[in-house]
Amino acid sequence: MKQIALYGKGGIGKSTTAANLSAALAGEGLDILQIGCDPKHDSTRMLMHGTWIPTVLDLIRERGDEKITVDDVVYRGFRGVRCVEAGGPEPGIGCAGRGIIATFQLLERLNALKGDVIVYDVLGDVVCGGFAMPMREGYAQEIYLVTSGELMSIYAANNIAKAIARLSRRVRSRCTLGGVICNAKNIEGERELVDEFARRIGSRLIAYIPRSRIVQVAELQKQTVVEYAPESDQAAVYQELARTVYGNETTSIPTPLEMDELESFALEFVQV
């Protein structure tokens, strides 16, 4: 079983990438489980054709975890992809990372963490204990950083690289960096910038996903691009990403940049 996690700044398109990746992997005949680890609980919505599935935290609050069954938390979406949403606390109360911890504990008890590939879609703005759990506890063996050429997105990716480097020193954790995915924002020189960032942290750019209107059109139809426009160039990008990720045997322990190095790096690519 291959377990991968996509981390990235909120709003970077991480969930769109994860859903299309899962859809493309399922198209190869693989059994896929996607777990949304974000309080917005929208990771699997396009796989579920717009349905907001109940979150683990909501169900625990309503029933208590002892009364929850697999069918209560695991839903089948497009191409049979199994979908789970961790959820988050009520606004202003509690810790968002707690939803992830509770989700993993419940799924383990229900023996639901299985399949050919598990895709964890994780918020990466703050890599606190809860959000780092897929890495820290050895669930996600390969981490993929989703970023654009925007400085704050690169900054978040670099912070996640720091977490990977730190956690990799612990015997229990087996996480490594599988590569960097550029979800483009149409910034001048963006591909070169992200490619160089990946190189400097000891990794590689494994996919460049161009900005395309078809992504928004598909989402308005409550579908992934892979389902809505399977013959499109954009779908082909996601299908190639799926093949690359599934066949990837080259991972690394990253060497994240210090803040002054990150700022100097950004200045190299800024057109003044």
UniProtKB/Swiss-Prot annotation:
- What top-level branch of life does the organism fall under? Archaea
Modification comment: The reversible ADP-ribosylation of Arg-98 inactivates the nitrogenase reductase and regulates nitrogenase activity.
Indicate where the modification ADP-ribosylarginine is found in the sequence: 98
Q: What reaction(s) does this enzyme catalyze?
A: N2 + 8 reduced [2Fe-2S]-[ferredoxin] + 16 ATP + 16 H2O = H2 + 8 oxidized [2Fe-2S]-[ferredoxin] + 2 NH4(+) + 16 ADP + 16 phosphate + 6 H(+)
Tell me, which GO biological process terms does this entry list? nitrogen fixation
Q: Which cofactor does it need?
A: [4Fe-4S] cluster
| Key word GTP-binding present | no
Q: Where does ATP bind?
A: 8-15
Enzyme Commission number, as recorded? 1.18.6.1
Q: How is the cofactor bound?
A: Binds 1 [4Fe-4S] cluster per dimer.
Q: Which UniProt keywords apply?
A: 4Fe-4S, ADP-ribosylation, ATP-binding, Iron, Iron-sulfur, Metal-binding, Nitrogen fixation, Nucleotide-binding, Oxidoreductase
Q: Does the keyword 4Fe-4S apply?
A: yes
**Residues bound to [4Fe-4S] cluster:** 95, 128
- Give the enzyme's main class according to its UniProt record, as a single word: oxidoreductase
The UniProt GO MF terms for this protein read: 4 iron, 4 sulfur cluster binding; ATP binding; metal ion binding; nitrogenase activity
The family classification in the record reads: Belongs to the NifH/BchL/ChlL family.
What is known about what this protein does?
The key enzymatic reactions in nitrogen fixation are catalyzed by the nitrogenase complex, which has 2 components: the iron protein and the molybdenum-iron protein.
The subunit structure is:
Homodimer.
Q: What is this protein called?
A: Nitrogenase iron protein
